[in-house]
């Protein structure tokens, strides 16, 4: 009885204690109620949803021990957090770059990958769209890159077809920007292209000699550049004014003229500019003898050299366009008259219809045609020697008669003297002969480096002006 009474009292004391909640328990319940009533952050809700989803997808393995269950739960929680961060980053990237999103959508769109209708056209070569990142066509048909020699020929052909040296500059600048070639390689490429271009023009000149009726690409391009009815000196002045501001046109003309001189296509029909020099043009028309063909080539070569010289002086501001026109007018009159007096006897008879006959005939005019032609051929083949002989005999006293080259040198000297006297602005420094010589020497050396002139040709031009 004593033991039972003691146990009853213990039960009475314990049960009331378990029936009433602890102070901490009431605090947990109120906190739980407060958490239910308050709105939790969206990120926490998303994390819990992802965690529940992962738990359903990957149920934890039934292994004994509470520690195993806690490890799996932690692993799943880490996966859920990682997935959540990944989704959040993707959403931020989509908001920050809508354009990238558009591009991604287009990549997914299968219709964007379809070929154009032109790709299925059998009449198209397909080269226009085959290498869209290669507009210069530096690939073969099978897609393999061209060799260095093929590229040189391709560039030269493009320059020849378009008659524009700017084509080479564009291609080289692109290769330099891409880092495919160096500066030294660019200079080497320029020399090689100039050599191939010279061969192309020589080949075209030979074809033209075989079939004169077949128009060359150069004459076709030049046909539409000069109007039929233009005042001669007005057209020259307009050309000088344009050449002063257009460097591309000047470079193209210089390149073309230099290559033409080297290939010796000296027909006056290929030099439309000469028709604006009436005296000189009439002189050329009067020379139609086959024996005088060499002399005719010499006249055209030197006249073109002088025209280019005037263009360069105007372009670089040495003289104004108006002064250049006056210079060319004086050049046309003086050089034609002096050359007429140097022609052989049979040529003088033909020219007498266009020019008044001189009162006295020099010793050169009485020479035979055969002897004069032989001397002219010798003088033309050695332009350097003729200039040296002229310098060594300033008085003009020589046992042999002067040739046409020396006559032109004399005309150049008189034109320079005339140019110095007709200084409208009174600034004689612009016409200083030493400055002119330096300018011509620099230009000739620059053209040699660019492949526009041969070294021998440049030396001959420099000797012409150094003898002034």
Curated annotation (Swiss-Prot):
The UniProt PTM text for this protein says: O-glycosylated.
What are this entry's molecular-function GO terms? RNA binding
A GO CC term attached to the entry? extracellular region
Query: How is expression of this protein distributed across tissues?
Result: Detected in urine (at protein level). Expressed in brain, heart, kidney, liver and skeletal muscle.
Give the signal peptide range: 1-19
Kindly list every residue the record annotates as glycosylated: 37, 216, 231, 359
Basic and acidic residues bias: where? 29-42, 360-406
The subcellular localization recorded is: Cytoplasmic vesicle, Secretory vesicle; Cytoplasmic vesicle, Secretory vesicle membrane; Secreted
Xref: InterPro entries: SCG3 (IPR026197)
Listed under GO biological process in this entry are:
protein localization to secretory granule
Asked whether the UniProt record includes Cytoplasm among its keywords, one would answer no
Record Pfam families: SGIII
Q: Which UniProt keyword terms apply here?
A: Cleavage on pair of basic residues, Cytoplasmic vesicle, Glycoprotein, Membrane, Phosphoprotein, Proteoglycan, Secreted, Signal
Q: Where is this region: Disordered?
A: 23-69, 353-406
Membrane topology per the entry is: Peripheral membrane protein
Residue(s) carrying Phosphoserine: 37, 362
Q: How does it assemble?
A: Interacts with CHGA. Interacts with secretogranin II/SCG2. Interacts (via C-terminus) with CPE.
> What does the function comment of this entry state?
Member of the granin protein family that regulates the biogenesis of secretory granules. Acts as a sorting receptor for intragranular proteins including chromogranin A/CHGA. May also play a role in angiogenesis. Promotes endothelial proliferation, migration and tube formation through MEK/ERK signaling pathway.
- Entries under PANTHER family matching the protein: SECRETOGRANIN III (PTHR17388), SECRETOGRANIN-3 (PTHR17388:SF2)
This protein's name: Secretogranin-3
Q: Which organism is it from?
A: Homo sapiens
Q: Which gene encodes it?
A: SCG3
